[in-house]
């Protein structure tokens, strides 16, 4: 299987999406009130993720515009969020024990997101 975006139903007649590989979710979104908004967010990721900078917040780095942020959790694990130019988080990952796993998630979306199919399962 290839990398793919999946749009699925969420609570309260809303929609969410994820970016996965072989059925394993790498990134997932918040809920959207309209399916069109979820589709728009996916298109924004496809367009903006490949050239986005990475700010490692665990090293007190900062960033602006479209960017990936590596965040250290309270239990010394790491997760990634992709932030839009307006400062809103678009998607995030699970927490990883190793920062390298967080970096791999970023590289996967940068490399494989633009060409990934979108499966509308909602």
What residue ranges belong to the model's regions?
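A low-complexity, Ser/Thr/Gly/Pro-enriched, surface-exposed linker/loop concept
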Residues: 35-61, 104-119
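Short, tandemly repeated low-complexity microdomains enriched for cysteine and small residues
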Residues: 27-33, 53-60, 90-98, 117-122
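A structural feature that tracks compact, well-ordered secondary-structure segments
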Residues: 6-8, 16-20, 24-32, 41-45, ...
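N-terminal segment of the canonical double-stranded RNA-binding domain
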Residues: 1-12, 47-75
């Amino acid at each position: 299987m290839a990398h793919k975006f999946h749009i699925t139903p969420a609570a309260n007649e809303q929609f969410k999406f994820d970016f996965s590989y072989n059925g394993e979710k790498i990134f997932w979104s918040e809920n959207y009130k309209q399916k069109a908004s979820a589709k728009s967010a996916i298109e924004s990721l496809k367009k903006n993720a490949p050239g986005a900078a990475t700010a490692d917040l665990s090293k007190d780095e900062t960033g602006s515009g479209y960017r990936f942020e590596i965040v250290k959790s309270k239990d010394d694990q790491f997760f990634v969020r992709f932030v839009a130019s307006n400062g809103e988080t678009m998607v995030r990952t699970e927490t990883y024990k190793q920062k390298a796993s967080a970096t791999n998630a970023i590289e996967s979306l940068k490399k494989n997101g633009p060409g990934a199919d979108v499966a509308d399962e909602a």
